[in-house]
């Protein structure tokens, strides 16, 4: 299966999880490509003065995994904007993951995953799974492994 892993990553954390997922999917016999959503301008809690530098195309992939950080207790505005501009995800399996700093899922992680799924479903995508990595957790490595295993098992 040809799987696109499309991420927005400010600090490199989300991108590092995407690379681990790519490695696992490739080892399972899939063609997996990591692509980055890139922006210029300002982005932060309450600040969304940015423009897209890169917006990866989704049409060539059989399935997609979207990854983004939580920012200000919500999905990063860059990923929210990127997903909104996609014309269609019809017929595509979709999974999502987020990385976050605060220690509880309810401090933005659940909301961000819900928003990603909502947007993807509105574009016709079939959301089949998700994961949250809490970067500040002492269990971070185990969380990454668990999310990568779970998402890889979907395809």
Predicted features, each with a name:
Residues 3-35, 46, 50-155:
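FMN-binding flavodoxin-like domain, especially the glycine-rich phosphate-binding loop
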């Amino acid at each position: 299966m040809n799987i696109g892993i499309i991420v927005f990553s400010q600090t490199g954390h989300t991108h590092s999880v995407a690379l681990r997922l790519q490695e696992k999917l490739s080892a399972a016999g899939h063609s997996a490509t990591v692509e980055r959503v890139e922006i210029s301008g300002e982005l932060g809690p309450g600040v969304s003065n940015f423009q897209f530098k890169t917006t990866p195309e989704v049409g060539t992939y059989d399935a997609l995994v979207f990854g983004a950080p939580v920012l200000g207790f919500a999905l990063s505005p860059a990923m929210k904007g990127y997903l909104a501009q996609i014309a269609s995800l019809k017929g595509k399996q979709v999974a999502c993951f987020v990385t976050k700093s605060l220690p509880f899922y309810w401090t933005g992680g659940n909301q961000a995953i819900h928003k990603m799924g909502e947007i993807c479903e509105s574009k016709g995508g079939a959301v089949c799974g998700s994961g949250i990595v809490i970067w500040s957790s002492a269990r971070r490595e185990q969380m990454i492994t668990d999310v990568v295993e779970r998402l890889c098992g979907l395809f």
